[in-house]
């Protein structure tokens, strides 16, 4: 099952056997309806909150509305997912949740103040929620990619100069591939040890922890 706002990949997902529901991750009602629909098919074993936005702008060039939009899209939607899906999982006594953070959540990057606040909030929330629900069967983690070759990063990836400059800041000297991030998410949702919770896995080519 997938709740998506952009219907451009609906046919592709449906072809893979995914039940696609159009909705907005910032809408409490949409998430409640989605979770209720999924529960009709059985237990909810795993939830992925895969939401992001591209907002590279210094604070003096960003107004209150733009900042709040970044927080709503990323952090508020994550809380709603945690709250609503978490409640469904608590009634089962088990479940795994993964949230999308970013290297900006733990590393000071130029002009990333808004997204850093949002993703840093997600990481803190994940750690706290992992503690809250550890003895109730829920395992809650996050994945924090660096620059990855996705549609969201197209403003950088489509500019050769910007792409090369970004790559030079990464210890492995290349941007990430979406398949690499997907593999980590799959592991967390299906194969990670039962005692693995409250962790932030950085798929950023070493950027957040390695100096070369």
Q: What are the functions of these language-model segments?
A:
Residues 58-59, 66-71, 166:
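Substrate-binding pocket helix/loop in short-chain dehydrogenase/reductase
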Residues 60, 107-113, 135-136, 173, ...:
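Active-site loop immediately N-terminal to the catalytic Tyr-X3-Lys motif
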Residues 82, 118, 126:
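Active-site helix of classical SDR
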Residues 87, 131-132, 194:
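Alpha-helical segment proximal to the catalytic Tyr-Lys
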Residues 102:
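Residue(s) in the substrate-gating loop at a strand-loop-helix junction
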Residues 107, 186, 197-212:
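Short C-terminal tail/terminal secondary-structure segment
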Residues 134, 139, 196-198:
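Short, small/polar-rich loop/turn modules that mediate ligand/substrate recognition or access, typified
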């Amino acid at each position: 099952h997938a709740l998506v706002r952009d219907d451009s990949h609906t046919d592709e997902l449906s072809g893979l056997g995914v039940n696609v529901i159009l909705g907005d991750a910032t809408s409490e009602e949409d998430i409640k309806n989605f979770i209720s629909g999924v529960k009709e098919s059985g237990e909810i074993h795993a939830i992925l909150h895969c939401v992001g936005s591209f907002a590279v702008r210094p604070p003096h060039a960003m107004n209150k509305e733009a900042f709040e939009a970044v927080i709503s899209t990323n952090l508020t939607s994550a809380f709603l997912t945690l709250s609503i899906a978490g409640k469904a999982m608590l009634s089962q006594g088990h479940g795994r949740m993964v949230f999308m953070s970013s290297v900006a959540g733990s590393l000071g990057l130029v002009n990333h103040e808004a997204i850093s606040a949002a993703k840093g909030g997600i990481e803190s929330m994940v750690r706290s929620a992992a503690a809250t629900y550890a003895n109730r069967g829920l395992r809650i983690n996050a994945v924090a990619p660096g620059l990855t070759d996705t549609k969201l990063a197209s403003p950088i990836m489509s500019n050769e100069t910007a792409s090369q400059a970004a790559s030079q800041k990464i210890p492995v000297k290349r941007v990430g591939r979406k398949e690499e991030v997907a593999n980590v998410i799959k592991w967390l949702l299906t194969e990670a040890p039962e005692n693995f919770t409250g962790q932030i896995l950085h798929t950023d080519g070493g950027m957040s922890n390695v100096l070369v």
